[in-house]
A protein has these predicted regions:
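Helix-hairpin-helix/helix-loop-helix acidic hairpins
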Residues: 56-106
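Structure-specific DNA junction-binding interface
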Residues: 1-62, 242, 246-264, 312-313
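Low-complexity, acidic/Ser/Thr- and charged residue-rich accessory regions of DNA metabolism proteins
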Residues: 171-292, 296-315
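Phosphate-backbone recognition surface of nucleic-acid-processing proteins
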Residues: 121-172
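Generic structural signal for hydrophobic core residues of well-folded globular domains
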Residues: 3-11, 79, 102-105, 120, ...
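Active-site-adjacent structural elements in folded domains
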Residues: 81-89, 97-103, 124-128, 167-179
Length: 315
């Protein structure tokens, strides 16, 4: 349920917004189609975009609702609550069978069904060979067409399999010092995604290449918050990731940062004044200066008269 719900919207901010409104850990036990629908509608009314531009599901009124998110939530309700799709999934004999189970539902489409099957396979629910099945999405098809002049009648999936199986030979042939994911080589899904990214890169770098897609709609926006990297535990690389990050990053001394921040805040507070305070201070200084000047002049005049008086006494 959680995998399906996240994948449909595929946006961390949407997930976090749901969690903040539900007030609990998102589980099937607290799923309510109407409640979730109202929460997401509220988010959209506030100006939030609840979908990402990647892995978008089909948009239609298949389940009779006017809004896209309502139909997608109805799809989740049908799959998880009514059909209990988890039962045939755990009984499936291979990854391709899971793909066909998911692809039989409306609003998903073949590519989304493949991505969803892969995500489920990353979990502890099932455990099939990741390279046992693949399909090429529209972006990967365009990327393959731009990489190969002629594929000798091979299908797009065959090209992805070939790239997956021959990656080490190609790295050596091209002199590429490819850095694997802590010893984990590229899988079929990775090569599929790479062909898709190649298509996007070529649109910008080589706009003259023949393609039915010319422009790049989405622009990368970095996330200021630090990323807590975590991979499927079955990959057995999370400990290595943490060790590598610990070697790269200096220890962060939070108490010192807090002390420094408080000291800086105090210093800024002592320096920053409002315009009215500055104006009052200037006025006070002006009055003080004027008074001191008058006092000095009066004192000087008295001294002069005293000196004259003393001089008269001498004569």
């Amino acid at each position: 349920f959680r995998i399906l719900l996240f994948k449909i919207f595929n946006k961390i901010e949407t997930w976090e917004y749901l969690e903040s409104k539900i007030g609990n850990y998102i589980t099937l036990s607290n799923f309510d189609l109407d409640v979730y629908s109202n929460i997401l509608q509220e988010a959209m009314d506030l100006g939030y975009v609840i979908y990402t531009s990647a892995y978008m599901s089909c948009a239609s009124k298949k389940f009779g609702y006017d809004k896209k998110h309502q139909n997608h939530l109805a799809l989740i309700d049908r799959m998880v609550c009514q059909d209990r799709v988890i039962n045939p999934i755990v009984k499936a004999r291979n990854l391709e069978e899971i793909f066909h189970i998911l692809a039989s539902y409306p609003l998903l489409g073949k590519f989304m069904a493949y991505q969803l099957a892969t995500d489920i396979n990353y979990s502890e629910v099932i455990n099939f060979d990741e390279n046992s099945f693949t399909i090429a999405g529209p972006g990967a098809e365009r990327g393959i067409n731009k990489c190969f002049i002629h594929t000798q009648g091979k299908s797009y999936a065959d090209v992805i399999y070939w790239m997956t199986e021959n990656q080490e030979n190609e790295f050596q042939r091209l002199g590429l010092n490819f850095q694997s994911l802590w010893g984990r080589p590229l899988k079929a899904i990775d090569c599929q995604n790479l062909f898709c990214e190649t298509d996007k890169y070529c649109r910008e770098a080589f706009p003259g290449l023949k393609s039915n897609r010319k422009k790049i709609k989405a622009k990368f926006t970095p996330t200021p918050q630090p990323i807590d990297y975590f991979y499927p535990p079955k990959w057995c690389i999370n400990d290595q990731v943490q060790e590598t990050l610990a070697q790269r990053l200096p220890p962060l001394e939070i108490p010192n940062l807090q002390d420094n921040g408080q000291q800086l805040s105090l210093e800024l507070d002592s320096l920053v004044k409002t315009a009215s305070e500055i104006s009052d201070n200037v006025s006070k200084l002006h009055k003080k200066y004027t008074q001191e000047t008058q006092n000095k002049k009066s004192k000087a005049l008295k001294n002069t008269e005293l000196q004259k008086s003393q001089q008269l006494c001498l004569f």
